[in-house]
């Protein structure tokens, strides 16, 4: 870090990028580079250089994440900086999400969507094209919902595959969803809607590799599973937005009006939601079906 400081002042840099902060060290401390002491003291040195009244600079410090998805090292590092941006994504998928988890000068939770290509990170300007598969008609095992990421509303397509298991313990696989959440939804389907999955393998994923972070997608997940099990397609202009409780009842989700307006703008024709007080006349091109529970939805979608 001592040599870096000399170089920064020599070049009179306006923006400094340290990749990564854990690889820098100060000679005045005996601790190894990457240790909590070295990391914090190097970060403190960066703060001093950034706030120097004679020459103010912007510093970008790249840091590592641990396996639980938190910043590696002391939380003090997070408190030192003005903004924390987390770049998240799986190595086998192109999708990368850039999320602001701390921002002293603006809102947090905002999300940027990018695709990792040969030439680097490319902005996803049209999420609908990226996350939704273009089809002329519906297909078995597919259902669409809308999920909130920061202030953005994203269409999300859930694909499911249900197949007979010949093993004592059926497989439940969901890369986009926590296994406990998937098992809970399967149990609700079985007990509250009569979809017997006790001897069936169930695999689900969200197209594009998007992680499911909202309960509002519960209904779409369950409908996609039921569609695959019953071998009946769902109309590709129909969407499902509701949290599903353990009783099988549909619960309303936050900002339902803005979600419905966005879906109407995108050309969807029908939306299944939980009971809530909305004026259906506001949506001229979107049929809104308020349902009480998951059993009602399955009956209306597949058996009418």
Q: Which residues does each PLM region occupy?
A:
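Peripheral, non-AAA+ core regions of ATP-driven protein-machinery
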Residues: 1-15, 21-304
């Amino acid at each position: 870090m001592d040599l870096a400081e000399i170089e920064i002042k020599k070049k009179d840099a306006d923006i400094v990028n340290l990749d990564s902060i854990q690889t820098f060290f100060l000679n005045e401390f005996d601790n190894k580079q990457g240790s909590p002491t070295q990391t914090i003291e190097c970060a403190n040195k960066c703060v001093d250089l950034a706030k120097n009244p004679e020459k103010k600079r912007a510093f970008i410090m790249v840091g590592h994440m641990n396996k639980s998805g938190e910043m590696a090292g002391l939380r003090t590092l997070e408190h030192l900086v003005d903004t924390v941006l987390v770049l998240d994504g799986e190595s086998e998928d192109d999708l990368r999400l850039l999320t602001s988890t701390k921002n002293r000068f603006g809102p947090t939770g905002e999300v940027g969507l990018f695709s990792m290509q040969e030439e680097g990170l490319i902005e996803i300007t049209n999420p609908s094209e990226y996350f939704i598969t273009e089809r002329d008609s519906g297909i078995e095992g597919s259902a669409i919902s809308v999920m909130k990421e920061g202030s953005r509303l994203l269409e999300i397509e859930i694909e499911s595959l249900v197949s007979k298991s010949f093993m004592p313990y059926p497989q439940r696989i969901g890369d986009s969803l926590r296994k406990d959440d998937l098992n809970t939804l399967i149990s609700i389907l079985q007990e509250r809607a009569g979809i017997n999955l006790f001897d069936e393998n169930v695999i689900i994923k969200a197209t594009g590799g998007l992680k499911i972070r909202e309960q509002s997608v519960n209904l779409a997940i369950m409908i996609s599973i039921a569609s695959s099990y019953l071998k009946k397609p769902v109309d590709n202009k129909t969407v499902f937005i509701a949290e599903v409780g353990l009783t099988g009842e549909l619960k309303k989700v936050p900002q339902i009006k803005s979600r419905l307006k966005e879906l109407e703008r995108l050309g969807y024709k029908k939306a299944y939601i939980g009971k809530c007080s909305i004026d259906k006349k506001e949506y001229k091109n979107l049929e809104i079906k308020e349902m009480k529970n998951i059993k009602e939805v399955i009956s209306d979608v597949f058996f009418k």
